């Protein structure tokens, strides 16, 4: 799993991450191609054309980028566009540039539609993120990277119980590695993003209330008392709890966590014994 952040000159981890998203600035285009990209040859640089709401402005900026690329194809970068538009596709069709959209797939319809546009990456959100086994299989067959935001509680219905929304605890991030290619943190402050990177990529644990790190959680969920098996089924459950009501795993785990918290008990798995058992 690779990690991606938005560029900020205030970030202390800009040279650590695998991917950098940098917003296109027409006033700094020379600096972008002659200084920034050459300084990050070992990282994937993704130029974002997402600031302008005007389609024609985005097309003109895209033309400038493609023109520079055609003059020097040794420059390595990819492009992120705000959404699908046929005018964008017309400009890109005769290039070898890789591109994807800021818009996410939260349904099979959107997922299939994005695949049809030959994108390099797709963001997966909401209930579709509960079928990551199937999503990843199809995406990888099409040479498409699966991207997720782990630090946001995601649902198309914001009144849904928090425990039924998609999010990833730092303790569970390794379980998602077979299915997720890129982990990108949601936020706009460099210090905040640097902290997320440390928590998820380095520490892989959070001793406390998930409200403090998961955007959109409205209820207290103490990560210390969530049992280690929490993510194992959520990766591929398809949200059966909402389809037939037979699965209540998440709710039961939440109830159990409250009991464990009251008893001051923390459940842990011995990873060495677990590896020996699965060997």
Feature annotation, model-predicted:
Residues 1-113, 117-279:
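Active-site pocket-lining/capping segments in soluble small-molecule metabolic enzymes
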């Amino acid at each position: 799993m690779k990690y991606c952040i938005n560029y900020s000159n205030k970030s202390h981890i800009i040279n650590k991450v695998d991917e950098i998203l940098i917003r296109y600035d027409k006033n700094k285009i020379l600096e972008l191609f002659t200084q920034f990209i050459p300084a990050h040859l070992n990282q994937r640089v993704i130029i974002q054309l997402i600031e302008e709401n005007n389609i024609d402005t985005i097309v003109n900026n895209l033309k400038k980028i493609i023109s520079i690329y055609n003059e020097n194809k040794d420059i390595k970068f990819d492009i992120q566009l705000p959404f699908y538009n046929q005018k964008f596709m017309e400009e890109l069709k005769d290039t070898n540039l890789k591109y994807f959209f800021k818009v996410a797939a939260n349904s099979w319809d959107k997922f299939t539609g994005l695949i049809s546009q030959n994108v390099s990456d797709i963001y997966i959100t909401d209930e579709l993120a509960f079928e990551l086994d199937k999503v990843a299989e199809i995406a990888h067959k099409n040479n498409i990277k699966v991207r997720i935001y782990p630090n946001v509680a995601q649902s198309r219905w914001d009144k849904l119980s928090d425990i039924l929304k998609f999010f990833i605890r730092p303790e569970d991030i390794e379980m998602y590695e077979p299915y997720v290619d890129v982990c990108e943190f949601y936020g706009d402050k460099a210090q905040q993003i640097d902290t997320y990177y440390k928590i998820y990529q380095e520490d892989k644990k959070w001793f406390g209330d998930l409200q403090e790190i998961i955007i959109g959680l409205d209820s207290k969920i103490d990560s210390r008392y969530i049992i280690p098996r929490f993510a194992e089924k959520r990766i591929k459950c398809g949200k059966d709890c909402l389809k037939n009501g037979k699965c209540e795993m998440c709710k039961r785990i939440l109830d159990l966590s409250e009991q464990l918290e009251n008893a001051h008990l923390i459940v842990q798995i011995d990873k060495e014994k677990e590896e020996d058992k699965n060997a």
